[in-house]
A protein has these predicted regions:
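Detector for conserved single-position "signature" residues within domains
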Residues: 1-136
């Protein structure tokens, strides 16, 4: 996946979270869905998600769209749909923590991202299902 070079995003590096002393992923069972998504999301074409941020140059760096896509995909897969419940899970649930690490989005960030990119998620879900079918 090609990332735009102009815009600076808050860093998202799930592999680095595994190096932490308290790595949440270490406590998850092998084969957990979150590992599949952490491997899958960087391979998705998220260029349209990034494009919407390229025009805005003011303010602090936004969350990496890949983090928010991964977070929402996982939340939907496990039946968590409310942005407030997703944000709460990012504080307590090991699988959610494996995605967000120490940089946890609040409910408004999650909600705004979902609203702003709702039309793009149908393509992402289709792409994920295709890759999952290939993987078996």
């Amino acid at each position: 996946m090609a990332r735009p070079l102009r815009k600076k995003y808050r860093p998202w590096n799930p592999a680095a979270y595994a190096q932490l002393r308290y790595a949440p992923a270490d406590r998850l069972p092998e084969g957990d869905l979150v590992f599949f998504l952490l491997d899958l999301v960087p391979r998705l074409d998220l260029s349209r998600f990034y494009a919407s941020y390229e025009v805005e140059t003011r303010g602090a760096p936004p969350f990496d769209p890949a983090l928010l896509v991964c977070l929402l995909l996982y939340a939907y897969c496990v039946g968590v749909f409310s942005s407030r419940k997703i944000a709460a899970a990012c504080e307590r649930n090991l699988a959610f923590l494996a995605i967000v690490g120490d940089d946890r989005p609040d409910f408004r960030t999650i909600s705004d991202f979902r609203k702003e990119h709702l039309d793009l998620f149908a393509d992402v879900f289709t792409e994920v299902l295709g890759i999952a079918a290939e993987a078996g």
